Amino acid sequence: MAEQHGKTLVPQIRFAGFTDPWEQRKLGDELEFLRNNTLSRAELSESEGTAFDIHYGDVLIKYGSVLNLEKAKVPRIMDSAIADRQTCDRLQDGDVIIADTAEDSAVGKCTELCNSKGKMVFSGLHTMPLRPMGEYASGYLGHYLNSSTFHSQLLPLMQGIKVISISRSAMADTTMTVPSVDEQRQIGAFFDRLDSLITLHQCKYCGVASWMLGVALVRLGSESDGAFGEMKHVLR
């Protein structure tokens, strides 16, 4: 919750030591729209090629609010000649990639690039790449633009029935809430730690689930009747 004071907001819950109000600004005044390419999934590879290409399907399903290029598996442009011919903008740390098309209201989900370390990275099919024109703390934009507070603005702006999309002009007219850079840094770090904790518990859950499934299969396989018993007999 936050109290409105003209064009500023004062959050009721925040990190200790911060008292300045949060400013409200138009997205189009803060972020510059870059050029993407339209390469299909068939032109990408999981291992071949040197230029990375961020596909909208991965933004929607695979990537979190922050895309760490050193850790994430990002597809590459398979044909180096095609990669060399790209006229779209090369991405850098802090750029935000938004999925502008989806089959549901997930349209607008984004990821913020980090740890690109000079690698050639492009924004691919059905994406909307943006670059901050001013200083923003790492991780803040990715987490904020994925928040329900911001995403609720996009719902009435979405177009289509079977395939839903949002335009650049509509995105540019949305309103962002912008704290000081120091407070952004605290917010980004907090959600990064939270994401890491969630991932850790998901890994633990998957490990326990796999172990339980293995135990169940062993028990079923030990029975003389049924498909598992027959399978065990065949494997012997």
How would you name each of these model-derived features?
Residues 7-8, 94, 172-173, 186, ...:
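Histone-fold recognition with a strong bias for associated Lys/Arg-rich disordered tails
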Residues 4-11, 41, 120-127, 158-185:
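A short glycine-rich beta-alpha junction/loop motif
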Residues 13-38, 43, 226-236:
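Non-catalytic DNA-recognition/assembly elements of restriction-modification systems
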Residues 29, 185-197, 201:
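Extracellular/lumenal glycan-associated surfaces
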Residues 28-31, 42-81:
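DNA target-recognition patches
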Residues 55-59, 72-146:
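A short beta-sheet element
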Residues 23, 198-213, 221:
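Extended intrinsically disordered, low-complexity coil regions enriched in Ser, Thr, Gly, Ala
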